[in-house]
């Protein structure tokens, strides 16, 4: 028997064949659907991106942060300040918002990395509250009332509202696809192996030569930068930002944690499932106020009791399906018969 290493699975190949036309249809959505669907799918796209980033932190690097809303707010405020007070072009401000959030994450990481376990989670939340309180006290940021985008800024995107909606939708879709692709490729690399080693046992991974601090530092800062860019795009669509909205733990962290835990933490597929569950519940129960939050809590408890590894974790355990395989499999195959040439 011959041995060969495979990374793809039958399920992943079939999924790629299905996902490609779906992605093409989503890209073409502005030409065959209305603004309502574009706004909904754009929201699904940036929630998926946020969930993948938090899953990378908690599910693979073992950094259970409950303060990622800090970088959503920082990215949003950077966009509004640069376009408003500094009269910067909106696209340039978008490009700066992400690196700005990543830059702020550098000193934050040195503070919170001194903490472990639940203390790390609490520390990230405290830092987020510090940013929210600071924003509510700074007059140039609108203090407690926040900031709004002017019509002149919106015209930089497009003078036509329908074209502007289409551009913002495509930007949301693009950032979601890029984030998912980066996470997938990262986890397939040696850096992904280092992340999972740190998550499973930091002392053991350090003894094997993994630079644990540098690896966690890079992942934390990179996810903060991506989260800041997503936050800027979110509030560019919402047209207004305030400390309560930008640094909301419920909107940008609790919901994301729900998606990841329900779908399956430590899997790329999990955030997809969790996002669909959350959006479906919210849309079906939209007429009942916040009752969907109660139902979300009940579903979360039920899933954690019946399937601690999440919905996709249960699927993997039962059916061994992997749509985004990140590991390697050793496959035994019959030897290839030698070719004989006829004379």
Locations of regions flagged by a protein language model:
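Transmembrane alpha-helices and adjacent helix-loop boundaries
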Residues: 1-343
